[in-house]
Structures are given as C-alpha cells and as structure tokens.
Amino acid sequence: MLEIWEDAIQSNAWPFVEAKKILDSLNGKTPEKGYILFETGYGPSGLPHIGTFGENARMVMVQKAFEQLSSIPTKLICFSDDMDGLRKVPSNIPNSEMLAQYMDMPLTSILDPFGEYESYGAYMNAKLRSFLDKFGFEYEFYSSTKCYKAGMFDEMLLKVLEKYDEIMELMLPTFREERKATYSPFMPICPKTGKVLQVPIEKWDAKRGTVTYKDEDNNYIEVPVTGGHCKLQWKPDFGMRWAALKVDYEMYGKDHLANARLYSEICRILGGKPPVQLCYELFLDENGEKISKSKGNSISVDDWLKYAPVESMALFMYQNPTRAKRLFFDVIPQNVDAYITFNQKYHLEEDRAKRFANPVYHIHHGHVPKIETFGITYSLLLNLTSVCNPSDKSVLWGFISKYAPKATPNTTTYLDRLAEFAIRYYDDFIKAHKSYYTPSEKHKVILRDILDMLSSISEETEGEVIQKSIYDIGMKAGYENLRDYFKDLYQILLGQNEGPRLGTFIKLYGIKEMKKLIERKL
C-alpha cells in the first residue's frame, strides 16, 4: 500500500489528488459508520443526459482511486430528488399537456405519462437506474420520497426546527426583499391537494415537531415536519442530506458553486461535517455558450455512442474536470484518437507513477484492456472513408487488410468497431460539407511531381518516406508556409481543410489507388 501511495501521489492524477483530500479529512480514522460515502445527485424532472454520465464516471474514478490508497470500505449512492414539486411542464415527452394539472405536485405523485410506472418520478428513476446499469456503475439508489416518508431524515428535520432561527439568519441575506417575506426552509405537503407548498410559515414548534401555515382559505394548518409531511427547500435539503447520511465526498457543477457555502454551513449547524467537495465546470457548445437541453445545443449519450466507443466519452469526462470544455461533434474523433494514444502509451510504460498518471488507468479502474489498431487512427479511417465513400465497412477492410495483413474484423474487434463508427460519422457530418478545390496550373505541377514520385516507389515503401518526399515537393514549390501547401492538397484531394499525414494515409489507401485519385484531379 505504501508503494502504491507514493506512486499515486507522484502521479498527480486528479482522482488520486481528490482521494488524498478525503483521507486527509479523516485524520487517519475510519468514520464511525464504517465506510466512506460518495454521493451523486439526480433531478428526475428530465431524462439522464451526458452530464449524468460525466458526474457518475468521475465520481467512480475518485472512489476507485481512494480504494487504491486505503482499506476503508466505500459506498456510492445516487440520490434522486424525486420529491421535488413539478415546476415546469416538460415539452419533450408524450401527453405533456396532461402534466399541467400536476403543477407543484411531488414527481412521485404524478401519473406516468408514458404509462409504464406508478408515477412520473418512478419512470425517470427507472431510466436513471437503467442508464447507470448500462455503463456498469456500482451504486445504491436512494429516493428522496422514500427517505422522507420512511423517517430516514426525521432526526435532522427536527434539528432544522430547533435551529430554525439560525438557518433563517443564514438564508435570508441571500434573497431579495420580496422573497425574504415568504421564505421558510420547510415546504409543507398540502394534506388536501398533495402539493409541495412554498408558503410563509406562521409558527414553528420544536417541541411538537410541527410548522403552521395558512391555506388558501385563510385557515391555519399545522403539520409535522417528519414522516414526509414536509420537504426542505433545495439548499437546506442539500446540507441536511449531508448531515443525515454522513456524506464524505460530493461533486457538483459550477451552477452550485455559489450555494456550496450554504450547504456546508447548514450541515455544520445540524451537527454534521461537510464532505470533501469538487466543483466541476459545465460544458460549452462550439460557440462557447453554455449548453442547454432546451436550446438543443448539446450532444446526448446516444449521439456519442453512435459514433464512438464509450471509453472515448469517459476520456472526455476525465480530462480537466475543473476547466470549461466545448462539447460538440468535432470533439468525438479527437477523443477516440487520444484514447488510442493513451492506451498504447500505458502498455509500453513500466513506471507505475506514469501509469497512474495515464487517463486510461482511471477510465478502466486499473484494468486496462490492450487494444491493437496497427497504427490506424479514427481520423485516418474518416479520411479513408472520405475518398472511397463506402456503403459498408467491408470496403474499408479491403484497404485495412492490405495495410495490416494481420488485422481481421474477428481478431481486431476494436478496429472493426472504429470502421463502422467512421462510416456513420462521415455520412452524418463530413459528406454534406465536402468542398473540392479545383487545382490551378501551379497545383497541377505539384500533383504531377507527387504522381511521378509515387510511380518511382514500391508498395512496400514506408509511410514516413512517402511523407518526406511530399514535404520536399512542397519545399521545391516555393510555399512560405507548408501548412498552406498541405491545406491545398487536402482541399484538392479530400475536399476538406484538414487531413492526415499524407504518407500514412497513402500507405493505408494504397499507392496505386492514390495515383488514380491524383489522375482524376488532373
């Protein structure tokens, strides 16, 4: 364990950095409950999305890193805020107009518009669990409704009542004057309608364990705060939950950062110890704007998995969680190729600290599969697809088999999947945007020089040799910036502004095929 500790700390990989923070917070002691509790949250008003995957994937990376550094048992819970009242009717579900009658009702008290479960909240919870199970996450599921109604939070809810004034002193300065007049940490559940009420509390009684409010008929209604008769506002709820469940580690998006101090302070007021926390940045679209489900400027998990393996998505989540990242379709090929590079480096590396620093160690929790692509990248396959416009992957395999005779669809399954992904990505994102440049007389001279060079070499010539020869032709052509030279070649030959190392690409595509392509352009 000591050797692993030293190498893990030396690696400076962020999951190990976070795991050490948890250990430091324990002062060398195992918690009284006997385990370390990691918590992720889910708002079941909408379907699980790529952010849900990201938070859970990152959380498990920290959990597994902690398990490498300590023998203290761990547990991960996914907490669903399914007792929240419906504040807005979602537009992207069937029978959405039916939900309008359930405004302010707890999500678990609303009929399922899909007709599959006992409630809308239950439907969304089932989707979450199915989603997490699909990716192999090991977790315990907690329902806010069940926790409140089963009395799991009763002790802490009575403490909130005891500390009512102190909590109000903390919360009120954060609101505008209008909200200050009506705010209370408790939201009673209306005995008549079942709605979650945001009403002023007229009286609170710590001894009786009740709060009193006025209903719409101006009658005073007294309800217990325990047993699911009240729910806390979301900010106090966060801190109360930390105290009640004794959460040791939580991560949340930047949209929570301004309130994190409140969560922690409420946890302390209730006698709890706030968890170690990580605030991760939110995703941006290609224009640098915040991603919004309502705007439709995001990528769904299904979108990503249509074009790339899941580990490439996990790599995107691993990289720099505290830095804002653009999430759009162009990042998919980049992350696939980055994953391939990291995977190859991992298996060549003998230094354990450097292995610990490699993202694939954390993506696969220390059990990294060895993949073989014979030097063929996703980007290279996209460019190959671009010139041969295949109807299915067997066309690509015709070129792959010549380039790497040992590779077959059955033995090189990762590469086979990439070929399939590449065709889908090309069809959906590249094909419609291709724009070929008509070669000028100067370009025709260059193309003839490349054609002569290719005619003078054999099929066995290495890609690097071909690359250098093409480079030399560009130098001879008098380009001040060779990036412009290669850009011209990409536009003429591939119909795009960027492309692969041409030597490697020609080796994969075949010298004979490349000569035919150039002849067509001439």
Curated annotation (Swiss-Prot):
Keywords annotated in UniProt: Aminoacyl-tRNA synthetase, ATP-binding, Cytoplasm, Ligase, Nucleotide-binding, Protein biosynthesis
Broad class of enzyme this protein falls into: ligase
InterPro entries linked to this entry: aa-tRNA-synth_I_codon-bd_sub2, aa-tRNA-synth_I_CS, aa_tRNA-synth_I_cd-bd_sf, Lys-tRNA-ligase, Rossmann-like_a/b/a_fold
Single biological process term from Gene Ontology: lysyl-tRNA aminoacylation
EC number: 6.1.1.6
Gene giving rise to this polypeptide: lysS
Descriptive protein name: Lysine--tRNA ligase
Residue ranges of the motif 'KMSKS' region: 290-294
Keyword ATP-binding: yes
Keyword Protein biosynthesis on entry: yes
Catalytic activity entry: tRNA(Lys) + L-lysine + ATP = L-lysyl-tRNA(Lys) + AMP + diphosphate
